[in-house]
UniProtKB/Swiss-Prot annotation:
Pathway: Cofactor biosynthesis; ubiquinone biosynthesis. The lineage of its organism: Eukaryota, Metazoa, Chordata, Craniata, Vertebrata. One of its GO terms (cellular component) is extrinsic component of mitochondrial inner membrane. It is a peripheral membrane protein. It is found in: Mitochondrion inner membrane. InterPro entries: Coq4 (IPR007715), Coq4_euk (IPR027540). It is an enzyme of class 4 (lyase). GO terms for molecular function: 4-hydroxy-3-methoxy-5-polyprenylbenzoate decarboxylase activity. It comes from the Eukaryota. Keywords: Lyase, Membrane, Metal-binding, Mitochondrion, Mitochondrion inner membrane, Ubiquinone biosynthesis, Zinc. Its EC number is 4.1.1.130. This is Ubiquinone biosynthesis protein COQ4 homolog, mitochondrial. Zn(2+) binds at residues 162-163, 166, 178. It comes from Danio rerio.
């Protein structure tokens, strides 16, 4: 039985690779017009189920397989994406985002202007987060398996604001910080992949970090994720000069206690 997950994962990788290649091949035919957006790969219900199960197993084995986490999110979150889309439609700023479809990429960021902003502003602290953690928004995969163009954008927006949530919540990119953000996202969005990550992420934490999560950090993340304004409805690109304190207040997000932030950063330095 111990060999079953590995065997299944190997079979999934082969099937997933073939399916992706086959579908991409179909998409390159000039006569094919089934794409709803440039990166779209149309799939049947059965194909989505196969992708969901296989990507779920792969993500469980290695939560850092962002490609598998992405596939899992796209193949399991349709109903939740509808609810998130509706929340955005009912928000003036969110509806503007749905209309204008901004993207958060290096090509759309004015890095020189952001670096000149005062400490404590969203733009300066977001850039600092990217630099200190050596991450870039360009690593966020394009949505492929969502069979609705507008919902695909909602999923893409969710991915591209993830690092902004790290900035807003003051969370590092170590496992504890990622789990805390995932708990916030689970309460905020209800996406199945976020709930799964929130449930299984703690299994990879040490006893001391698990204790910190259970006693204070997790409760803080769940409370704030559940009561905050929809984080997808914020036009962050127009708010770089706004201070984090002001934006947190507007979103109804509590800043984590100073002692808690210190504990998390200390945990990160030991990773």
């Amino acid at each position: 039985m111990r060999g079953l997950p590995g065997a299944f994962l190997g079979s999934f990788k082969t099937s997933y690779g073939y399916l992706s290649q086959r579908l991409y091949g179909v998409l390159t035919e000039e006569k094919y017009d089934g794409r709803l957006y440039p990166s779209h790969i149309p799939t049947s219900t059965v194909q989505k189920a196969i992708l969901a199960v296989g990507s779920g197993v792969a993500a469980l084995k290695n939560p850092y397989r962002h490609d598998m986490v992405a596939v899992l999110g796209e193949t399991t979150g349709h109903q939740t994406l509808i609810k998130l889309r509706d929340r955005m439609r009912n928000d003036p700023e969110g509806s503007t985002i749905l209309l204008e479809r901004p993207r958060i990429r290096l090509s759309t960021l004015d890095l020189s202007n952001m670096s000149a902003l005062p400490d404590g502003t969203l733009g300066r602290e977001y850039l600092r987060f990217l630099e200190e953690n050596r991450v870039t928004p360009d690593t966020r995969a394009e949505v492929k398996f969502v069979d609705n163009e507008e919902l695909a954008y909602v999923m893409q927006r969710y991915r591209e604001v993830h690092d902004l949530l790290h900035t807003l919540l003051g969370m590092p990119t170590n496992m504890l910080g990622e789990v805390a953000v995932k708990w916030f996202e689970a309460a905020q969005t209800g996406l199945p992949m976020c709930i799964l990550g929130a449930a299984l992420g703690p299994l990879r934490l040490s006893v001391s970090r698990l204790q910190l999560l259970g006693q204070s950090l997790g409760l803080w993340a769940l409370r704030n994720g559940g009561r905050a304004r929809c984080v997808l409805s914020i036009y962050y690109e127009r708010r770089w000069e706004q201070t984090l304190d002001e934006l947190r207040h507007e979103l109804n997000i509590e800043e984590p206690p100073v002692s808690l932030i210190a504990s998390i950063k200390n945990s990160s330095s030991k990773s």
